[in-house]
Amino acid sequence: MTTLAIDIGGTKLAAALIGADGQIRDRRELPTPASQTPEALRDALSALVSPLQAHAQRVAIASTGIIRDGSLLALNPHNLGGLLHFPLVKTLEQLTNLPTIAINDAQAAAWAEFQALDGDITDMVFITVSTGVGGGVVSGCKLLTGPGGLAGHIGHTLADPHGPVCGCGRTGCVEAIASGRGIAAAAQGELAGADAKTIFTRAGQGDEQAQQLIHRSARTLARLIADIKATTDCQCVVVGGSVGLAEGYLALVETYLAQEPAAFHVDLLAAHYRHDAGLLGAALLAQGEKL
C-alpha cells in the first residue's frame, strides 16, 4: 500500500509517495505560504498533492506544531496566526478522499530514526537541533505522543531560569539557548545579526565568541540529555538537525555529557535520516501504528 506523505514546515511544504518498502518516490516541494491564512495553506496543499494523490491509498502528515484531534496548535498560539486550529486531517481528507493521519514532525522523525536502530533498542529519544529544538520519545517500542500531542517537546524544558524569553512564552527554555535561533540571538559585537551557519563558520576560523556560543549550546543540550536519561532511562539519544549534525557539534555534546555523573550517561548517535525523516516516519506510522 502506498502512502502520500506530507511534511509541513515553517519554510517549506514537501510531499512524496512512500511504498511499503519505505522507498521515497516522486518527491515534491513548495514554499510554505507567507500568508498565515487557512485559505493560503489549503491552496498550497492542494497544489502539492494533486499530482500524487491518485497513486496513494492513504495520507500521512508530519507537521510543525502540536497536533491535537487532527488540528494544528502551538505552544504559543500567536506563532500560528490565522492557522490556529487549522483542521489538517479534515482538509487533506477533503482534498484527496483518502484516510489521513497527522503527527508532529519531530515525533514522526523519532519514529523513523527508531526504525533505523539496532533491533535490541526498545527505548530511545530523538532530538533535533535546528532553528528550534524538538524531539520524540520511543518507550517500549512505542512512540509517545500524549493525549494532547505535547510529548517530546523537550526544547521547552527549563535550561536557565534567568535565560532569554522563549517563543513559547517561558523563560530560559533549552530552545532559546541551544537552537540555531538561540545561538544567533546571543551574538554580540561583530557577530550581531549573523545566523547560526555563519557563527559555526567563524568558530572554525578561531573566532572566540563564536566558539563560546557553540559551547554554550552544546553544554545546554548535554544537560538536557542528562535530564532525559533520568526521566526515561533511554538506551540511546539520536541527535539530528542542521545544528545537531554540524561538524564537531555532537563531539562537544559528548564532552559535556561526560562531565555529568555516570548514571546520566547515554550513547549519543548522529541521525540516520536528514531532510526526509518526517515524511518517512509519518508513512511508517500510517502503515502500522494507530495514533
Swiss-Prot record:
Kinase found in the keyword field: yes
One Pfam family cited in the UniProt record for this chain: ROK
Residues that, per the record, bind Zn(2+): 156, 166, 168, 173
Pathway: Amino-sugar metabolism; N-acetylneuraminate degradation; D-fructose 6-phosphate from N-acetylneuraminate: step 2/5
Consequence the record notes for mutating residue 138 to M: 6-fold increase in catalytic efficiency for glucose phosphorylation. No change in catalytic efficiency for N-acetylmannosamine phosphorylation
GO biological-process terms attached to the record: DNA damage response; N-acetylneuraminate catabolic process
Documented EC number(s): 2.7.1.60
GO molecular function: ATP binding; N-acylmannosamine kinase activity; zinc ion binding
Catalytic activity: aldehydo-N-acetyl-D-mannosamine + ATP = aldehydo-N-acetyl-D-mannosamine 6-phosphate + ADP + H(+)
Family: Belongs to the ROK (NagC/XylR) family. NanK subfamily.
Subunit structure and binding partners: Homodimer.
Name used for this protein in its record: N-acetylmannosamine kinase
Organism of derivation: Escherichia coli (strain K12)
